Amino acid sequence: MNIFRLINYVLVFALVLTGLVTDYWISTSSLERNGKVLSSSFIHGGLFYGERQLDWGLGPSHQYFSVYDEITQKIGFMNKILWILVIFFIALGLFWSFIGLMISLLNTVAKERKTILGPSGIYLWSLLSICSYSAAIFIYLLQYYSTIQKNVLLPDQLTAGFSSTNRTQLAFSFYLIVAAIGSLFIPMSLLCFSNSIQQRPKTKTIPIDTTVFMY
């Protein structure tokens, strides 16, 4: 059980770190220009970097962009406050998950039953991680439905007739965080199941004295 919890926390840590640094939180597989769908034009972006490929009529043109730079220049599709909050809650969740990972590692070599270094700690750090990652997901969804679905293009690209309205979907980097949240429920569920089994009253066998006879 302890080894499984350790592996699970390593998995959660890997999922969240991968989701944090990869550039596929959102993806637009095709864009419109003056009402015409351009399958060779696309956009994908993460929390830090992204890529735009636009067909201006002379072939596709690649452009890598920094989310931070576009936010500071006030031309990006992310709100600065919401962007900071998303990163903050993911970082906070990683902190709680790291503590949970260390506690799980400790439990593979030591038995701590009634402190936060034992199973109760697994509940605590898992719940704190879930709350932090869920807050990040909620804030990002707020940004997604309020602005990202409407536009992920720059002002000059909009002026040129490009449009990404209702063509942007959540991509795999986002779902890695969702998968990490789901994974955190597994050790908690197993602990609940294990505790329920341990708390069941055990039937005691009463020895029978065969020398005593009832008449």
Where do the language-model regions lie?
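A surface-exposed beta-alpha-beta supersecondary segment
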Residues: 22-85, 162
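Interhelical loop segments of eukaryotic multi-pass membrane proteins
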Residues: 27-41, 147-160, 201-204
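Hydrophobic alpha-helical transmembrane segments
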Residues: 54, 86, 90, 164-185
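Alpha-helical membrane-embedding segments
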Residues: 61-72, 154-162, 183-195
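Juxtamembrane helix-loop boundaries in multi-pass membrane proteins
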Residues: 119-122, 160-170, 209-212
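Juxtamembrane loop segments immediately following a transmembrane helix
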Residues: 135-171
